Regions:
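Small-residue-enriched hydrophobic alpha-helices in membranes
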Residues: 1-120
Length: 120
């Protein structure tokens, strides 16, 4: 459950780091939210408020946040999981049909942290 939350955090900041929230990205996050019970939805809403604060502090803060999250996961998930999550994050990035510089940078950071090749 904690792993899912961390992945939600990463997906959320990636989808918002271009500071243009496309309707496709919104749909995607609402699909994720639909999987959760009402109690968990409340928790996720609080998390998004926290994540919005991180985003408001600028891309350097977001970068540090993603580095610390990906570091904490490094030894907890195997390579197959890393690849699956990177694919998921890539999907989130591609939803608005364009790759913003910030999205590319965060994706590359994740790839580097997890010893994977970036294909964006």
């Amino acid at each position: 459950h904690l792993l899912e939350l961390v992945m939600f955090d990463i997906a959320y900041v990636i989808s918002n780091c271009d500071y243009e929230y496309s309707s496709d990205e919104k749909k995607y996050l609402s699909v994720i939210l639909d999987r959760y019970s009402d109690d968990d939805k409340e928790l996720l809403k609080l998390r998004t408020q926290f994540l919005d604060n991180v985003l408001d502090k600028g891309i350097e803060e977001v970068k540090n946040f993603v580095i610390s999250l990906s570091n904490s996961l490094k030894s907890k998930i195997d390579d197959d999981m890393k690849i699956a999550y990177l694919d998921l994050f890539k999907e989130v990035i591609m939803l608005d049909k364009s790759v913003h510089e910030n999205e590319r940078m965060l994706y590359r950071i994740l790839c580097e942290q997890w010893d994977q090749k970036s294909n964006i």
